[in-house]
Design a protein with these regions (language model features):
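Flexible, glycine/small-residue-enriched loop-and-beta-strand segment within the central core
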Residues: 2-15, 21-33, 37-121, 147, ...
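Short coil/turn connectors at secondary-structure junctions
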Residues: 105, 138-139
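C-terminal/domain-terminus segments
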Residues: 124-133, 142
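Acidic, glycine-centered active-site loop in nucleotide-sugar glycosyltransferases
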Residues: 139, 144-147
């Protein structure tokens, strides 16, 4: 029986704003995390991810490359981002030309165990637990299901007001 090649995890080449709190163990590399944000244990955030100010990334979340998260967002336990849309009917198998970006606006809350495919989500959105977001979300509201659908619209808020 062969021995496995062991690779280290931890924090490598990550950039942090002021007052960022990280609970280890984590796997953060090549990412940027904004001021006053929190990263829970067992989180992986990959290179070139940008996370805004005052965000919470809860335990066991997976944030892959090409993801941008706005300010005042919550990524709940076990949420997962996917950049491979299986455009050719199967996985990209590392072919980065097939990967697509994901963008979350400000004041977005992603529920536990939700899966976010390559989409854009506008400001002031709540994605329910276990939802699968397959298409762009262009209207503030609460979305849930597989595929995620609008359950309820959210009224516009003034700048700086938190709806989450």
């Amino acid at each position: 029986m062969a021995e496995p090649r062991l690779l280290s995890s931890g924090i490598v080449d990550a950039r942090f704003g002021e007052n960022v709190r990280v609970v280890q163990p984590v796997n953060l590399y090549g990412c940027t995390i904004g001021d006053d944000s929190f990263v829970g244990p067992f989180v992986e955030i990959q290179r070139n991810v940008v996370i805004g100010k005052r965000c919470k990334i809860q335990s066991h979340a997976f944030v892959c490359e090409l993801v941008t998260i706005g300010d005042d967002c919550v990524i709940s336990h076990g949420a997962m981002f996917i950049i491979d849309p299986f455009a050719n009917g199967g996985p990209a198998r590392g072919d980065r030309r097939l990967w697509r970006p994901t963008r979350l606006g400000n004041h977005v809350s992603i529920g536990s165990n939700a899966t976010i495919l390559p989409v854009s989500i506008c400001d002031h959105v709540v994605i329910g637990a276990g939802a699968v977001v397959t298409k762009d979300v262009t209207e503030p509201g609460v979305y849930a299901g597989n595929p995620a659908r609008l359950l309820r619209r959210l009224a516009p808020t003034t700048e700086g007001e938190r709806i989450l």
